[in-house]
């Protein structure tokens, strides 16, 4: 109670995913409760919800985990030590979700496997394109990709 904050849920996102079997009275009670707590509520089809969270919530956990594994260079202690000293806000921001609770990562994987796999495959395609840009020294295509990402990011953040 001492650590409670009245604004804890202000503007937090809550997605309600009613189905044909959802009790409308219960849905209304939840809606009122979440709105009264200051939440930003939306209603969505459960299938679309699961696809969206696979892309914007679940996939980043596994990508960040891979990033951490990539830079944790056990075979080269000097590189590992210097990387640890140089890692700053960019690395911290990018890797934060990869350092989370492994049990949560497994639960998400088990409960949204198909959508997460689709997101991973799409990511692999995108990173392969970047890899090809590097191999071909095609800085123009790489710049185009980075510009698009900068523009598209505004849709999410």
List PLM regions with ranges:
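Long, positively charged, glycine-interspersed low-complexity recognition regions
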Residues: 151-157
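Active-site-proximal catalytic alpha-helix in oxidoreductases
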Residues: 24-37, 48-75, 84-99, 121, ...
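A generic membrane alpha-helix/interface feature
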Residues: 56, 78, 130-131, 156
């Amino acid at each position: 109670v001492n650590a409670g904050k009245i604004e804890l849920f202000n503007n937090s996102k809550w997605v309600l995913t009613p189905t044909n079997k959802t009790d409308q009275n219960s849905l209304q009670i939840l809606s009122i409760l979440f709105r009264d707590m200051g939440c930003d509520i939306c209603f969505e089809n459960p299938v679309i919800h699961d696809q969206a969270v696979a892309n914007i919530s679940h996939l980043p956990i596994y990508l960040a985990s891979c990033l951490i594994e990539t830079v944790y260079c056990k075979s080269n202690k000097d590189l590992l030590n210097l990387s640890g000293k140089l890692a700053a806000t960019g690395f911290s921001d990018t890797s934060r979700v990869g350092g989370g609770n492994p049990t949560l990562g497994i639960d998400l994987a088990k409960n949204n496997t198909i959508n997460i796999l689709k997101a991973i495959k799409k990511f692999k395609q995108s990173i392969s394109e970047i890899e090809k840009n590097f191999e071909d020294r095609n800085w123009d295509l790489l710049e185009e990709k980075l510009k698009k990402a900068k523009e598209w990011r505004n849709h999410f953040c």
